[in-house]
């Protein structure tokens, strides 16, 4: 390789690194997560392409679960397994499983166009846009335009908020170096932890969100629920930042999938 060519390549790499740093660093040395992301599949991150099937495929109800029961915790690197449920909530899960196996989705909030809830929202196979300002970070999910806000200004949930749980819950966060630490409470008990595991009104979610490489975001999630779980459940999700023209989320009209097209 010619010295001139090698120097040019090094300059390009260095400029790219500097450009990435200037984009990712926000405010007082904290990363800027702003952008549109898609889930990075196991073994690598998707290169910014929109999910196959798009909006119409997303209105199809998920297949019935085939596992015999929810078991295990984070035991194989980034491959999460299902939460360990207490006997009371294992019985609830059995009702959900039997309902799905019979072709009914009565107990499935997503199949009924309700929000996915937390932490399930962070594991959906759809795009997600993050908008970051000094005092808050807002997550917009492509699934049914669901959103959640993480407040960074030091506020705490009031008793009124705790008494009125929502699907996204109430999230507050702070920075520990380059990692955003988020605590979420006041979560609606009709949502699921994952795709089918129920939880109680006492569930809380802690996240540690950070860049693990340029444009690749990692969310390490710990779920605690003394009534529904025999021990805290951990899972990890990664997301790849999209580049134009794939950095635009599509409108998601979930109800159209339920009633059919008017035409």
Language model regions located:
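N-terminal secretory signal peptides that target proteins for export/translocation
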Residues: 1-7
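Bacterial N-terminal signal peptides
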Residues: 9-20, 24
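PEST-like low-complexity, intrinsically disordered acidic/proline/serine-rich tracts
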Residues: 2, 20-263
